[in-house]
């Protein structure tokens, strides 16, 4: 735990958590006790932020019982919602996406998905990949080419058949001037615009909520959490997380399959007498 010495919970104003592999269970669901924890945090004066590569509409659905009592950093920072209001939305350049598609087309094992506010555009005709997409991405639409230039693309991901780290390296070499490529899990690479990330989204929430970095706690497991984990006062890595995330974090807890985030939040509230 590379930064140590900041593991105590004091003067917390915001808690940000990643979703998949972090606060969600092994089946990709929000454990039921989470909703009560978020309500209790709000009563205690602590805001909760869902920080994810997922789109806002998906997160809003996941947290439906408490969606009006929390903030959202969605689509890896491209959608930021504070107190129910969209405060920022970053869209991808169509020309840059065209260049990215030309690169991914070189590799049979790379499958590109682009997202607008409602639709997941699957640029692939491989049936196995379509089944993978259907597992957890809403409104999938299989297409032969990028959507029209006037479509507001807010999120881009690449499904990788094998060797996700190698492919992230290749993509960084090919398109690093335009994008950041962050492995997410074993099969996905999140594509982020330069200057747009979960960390930039959290900074906007912090400004709106008047919270300093040392007053923010973040939970995460993957490389798309790296910047935010480095930025906040207390970073808590999952036991199932990537080694690099564990190394730079204040603390390492159990895996998401054991509801470790929920146990940590319960411990915080108990310590506060809430």
Q: What residue ranges belong to the model's regions?
A:
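Mg2+-dependent phosphoryl-transfer enzymes with acidic/Ser/Thr/Gly-rich catalytic loops
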Residues: 10-14, 31, 190-274
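Active-site phosphate-binding/coordination module
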Residues: 26-129
């Amino acid at each position: 735990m590379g930064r140590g010495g900041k593991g105590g919970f004091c003067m917390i104003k915001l808690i940000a958590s990643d979703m998949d592999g972090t606060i969600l269970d092994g089946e990709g669901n929000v454990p039921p006790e989470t909703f009560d924890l978020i309500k209790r945090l709000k009563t205690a004066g602590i805001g909760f932020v869902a920080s994810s590569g997922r789109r806002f509409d998906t997160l809003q659905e996941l947290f439906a019982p408490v969606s009006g009592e929390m903030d959202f950093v969605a689509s890896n920072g491209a959608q930021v919602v504070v107190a129910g209001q969209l405060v920022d939305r970053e869209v991808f350049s169509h020309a840059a996406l065209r260049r990215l598609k030309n690169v991914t087309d070189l590799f049979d094992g790379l499958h590109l998905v682009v997202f607008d506010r409602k639709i997941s555009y699957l640029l692939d005709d491989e049936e196995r990949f379509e089944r993978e997409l259907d597992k957890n991405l809403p409104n999938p639409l299989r297409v032969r080419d990028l959507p029209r230039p006037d479509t507001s693309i807010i999120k881009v991901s690449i499904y990788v058949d094998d060797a996700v780290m190698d492919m992230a390296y290749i993509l960084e070499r090919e398109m690093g001037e335009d994008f950041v490529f962050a492995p997410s899990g074993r099969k996905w690479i999140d594509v982020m615009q330069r200057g747009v990330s979960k960390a930039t989204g959290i900074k906007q929430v912090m400004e709106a909520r008047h919270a300093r970095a040392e007053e923010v706690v973040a939970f995460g497991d993957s490389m798309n959490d790296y910047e935010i984990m480095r930025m906040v006062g207390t970073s808590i890595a999952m036991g199932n997380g990537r080694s690099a995330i564990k190394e730079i974090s204040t603390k390492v807890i159990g895996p998401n399959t054991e509801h470790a985030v929920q146990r940590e939040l319960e411990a915080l509230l108990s310590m506060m007498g809430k």
